[in-house]
Design a protein with these regions (language model features):
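A binding-site-centric feature that preferentially detects glycan-recognition modules on secreted/surface proteins
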Residues: 1-226, 232-306
Length: 306
């Protein structure tokens, strides 16, 4: 057996790096059979100290986030805040999920404990997180459902901000035009929603600075209970417009798990300030003019399934 065959596929640089990592003395002891080697897989941390996804190894475009665009985490003390979000959901969608504030709080605390125990992903809770209930899915067509959810967004947003307006630039254009992106895991959420209400944690901006193609690319290396956001972002906006659309300085939100007419196009929410009327507003539209670029105020979101 030739020496050339034994190191086939290795460059000199890779071999030198291996010896450097081992240490020359240790490498020689291994070579002489003087020591045994045990291997332990290194668990990579997937989120930084701010709760942002570490974009290592992605091919799609990513840029640094502009932290002037941010969400404020409100203190979720007791059941009152949970109850307010649930009430907005029930009132605007005219549904009853059957999940109480006490039940949601208990489920969210359980999910947070799971995240804290996993060193790879524990940092995500350093960012903003929101308790969400996805209602039971009634319609077969996702475009029909999205139209209904966006109507609820308008009601909730203008109820919280009576002097503002919500502009849905795709109103009446979504039926039979919306699908789930492959490998986004959003189909797991949809499957659960067809069975009944689904509680979970919505993380609005762990992907700030990612293009929506990068949003989609990164999901495959996260633990299975993480889902790339789509419909859950809309429901989170229904429940918490005061956080997600506070003013111009809140990040714009990609619905990267959903495609509009083709996989090259998706959706986003954008909080804007209209200088003409001197008022903030919330817009919903498609991403046709954004791809494939990364913007420092845009973010995809993640949903952690309960």
């Amino acid at each position: 057996m030739s020496e050339r065959w034994m190191i086939q596929g290795w460059t000199n640089g890779e071999l030198n790096a291996l010896v450097k990592n081992l240490g020359e003395e240790t490498a020689r002891k291994i070579q002489r059979g003087e020591v045994k080697v045990s291997l332990e897989e290194v668990m990579k941390v997937l989120f930084d100290k701010h709760g942002r996804r570490i974009p290592e190894g992605l091919r799609a475009n990513v840029c640094d986030p502009n932290r002037d665009f941010r969400f404020d985490q409100l203190e979720l003390i007791g059941k009152a805040y949970y109850a307010n979000g649930i009430k907005r959901l029930h009132d605007t969608l005219e549904v009853d999920t059957g999940i109480s504030a006490k039940q949601l709080k208990r489920e969210i605390e359980h999910l947070l404990a799971i995240l804290r125990e996993n060193s790879q992903v524990a940092n995500i809770i350093n960012g903003v997180w929101l308790p969400v209930i996805m209602p039971k899915l009634e319609a077969d067509d996702l475009g029909t459902t999205l139209e209904q959810y966006l109507e609820a967004v308008g009601k909730s947003y203008t109820d919280v901000f009576p002097d503002r307006k919500f502009n849905n630039y795709l109103k009446g254009k979504l039926v039979d035009q919306v699908s789930i992106v492959d490998n986004s895991r959003h189909d797991q959420l949809i499957k659960r929603m067809r069975q009944g209400p689904v509680p979970g944690i919505h993380f609005p901006n762990p992907l700030q600075g990612f293009s929506f193609q990068a949003d989609r690319e990164q999901i495959v290396t996260l633990p299975e209970r993480f889902v790339l956001s789509g419909l859950d972002t809309v429901i989170a906006m229904v429940m918490y417009p005061d956080i997600l659309a506070r003013n111009y300085w809140t990040p714009d939100l990609d619905l990267a798990a959903l495609s509009y007419q083709s996989t090259a196009d998706s959706f986003y929410f954008e909080a804007l300030y209209d200088v003409v009327v001197d008022e903030d507003e919330l817009n919903f539209g498609d991403t046709a003019n954004l791809a494939p670029h990364a913007y420092n105020e845009f973010s995809g979101s993640l949903f952690f399934l309960g």
